[in-house]
A protein has these predicted regions:
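A boundary/linker detector
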Residues: 1-49, 94-123
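Residue-level detector of alpha-helix boundaries and kinks
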Residues: 19-22, 59-60, 89
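Short glycine-/acidic-enriched loop or helix-start segments at secondary-structure transitions
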Residues: 45-46, 62, 87
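Histidine-centered catalytic micro-motifs
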Residues: 50-58, 75-82
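Short, surface-exposed beta-edge/turn micro-motifs
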Residues: 31-32, 70-72
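Short Cys/His-centered divalent metal-binding micro-motifs
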Residues: 71-96
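Short linker/helix segments within small regulatory modules
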Residues: 56-71
Length: 123
């Protein structure tokens, strides 16, 4: 004979992962054009395989960038491999961070930005 398991009066609810808030980018339309190709070279051709780049990356800031819509779509050359790539060239990365902060400050204050991201990128 099988032993019957006692039923719990208050069964545990399964744990649910918190869903990340996905907001549209406030920096760029999702139109298939690399943000930096357009900005630096005036190239507005549509490209396939664009990467989503969170302007303020890193564990905590990536989530905040996603929630605030602070991300752009970049081609591989401007994201990772080229000389002007944001993960290679500090000047390009800083330019993008300043642009994102200025856009964020159109609807918020600088103090709110600093409180949220830990520092100001505008000198």
């Amino acid at each position: 004979m099988k032993k019957k398991e006692p039923e719990l009066l208050f069964p545990k609810q399964p744990k649910r992962r918190k869903r990340m808030k996905h907001k549209k980018s406030i920096l760029q339309e999702k139109n298939g054009i690399c943000f930096l190709c357009d900005l630096l070279e005036g190239d507005t051709r549509q490209q396939y395989g664009l990467h989503k780049h969170h302007v303020f990356f890193g564990a905590a800031n990536r989530k905040l960038s996603e929630e605030d819509g602070l991300y752009v779509y970049l081609c591989v050359r401007h994201h990772e491999t080229g000389p002007d790539a944001v993960h290679v060239n500090k000047g390009t990365r800083t330019m993008l961070q300043i642009y994102a902060q200025e856009t964020y400050e159109k609807t918020h204050t600088r103090e709110e930005f600093i409180k949220r991201y830990g520092r100001s990128y505008i000198q």
